[in-house]
Amino acid sequence: MGIRIGIDIGSSTTKIVAFEQEKMLAPMVVRADSQVASLYGAFGRYLYENNLELSDVDGVYITGVGSKYVDKPVYGRPTYKVDEFEATGTGGYYLTDKKEVIVVSMGTGSFFVKVTETEMKHLGGVGLG
């Protein structure tokens, strides 16, 4: 089916979203005491609530402080770690129709990323979770 799953494993919440080609499916936020439990629970729940099968998933893209605990493919699917600044910048840019944006992440760590059609630049701050 060509589904790509993006998961941000933060210090207090796990955010998950899927894309089918360029179409974004409904995002979800999950809380759990364990970041690994939150990752696997969020992924399973997301598949269930969106009527998706594991075989539909072409790739899992993870970021956030909790991604350091993941050292093997998630549920056997191809899994890739994405830099938090890149993930936030790309996501923020996707959500707007502007040609140049400054994306601000306001979580446990706060940072600024400038994104244009051809460039992404971390302006300052830290990504802590």
Annotate each language-model stretch with its function:
Residues G2-D8, G59-Y61, E100-S105, L123:
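Short glycine-aspartate micro-motif
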Residues D8-S12, V65, S105-G109, V126-G129:
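A short acidic Gly-Thr/Ser loop motif
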Residues D71-S105, F112-V113:
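Glycine/small-residue-rich loop that forms an oxyanion/phosphate-binding "nest" at active or ligand-binding sites
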Residues Y93, E117-G129:
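Glycine-rich phosphate-binding loop plus the immediately following alpha-helix
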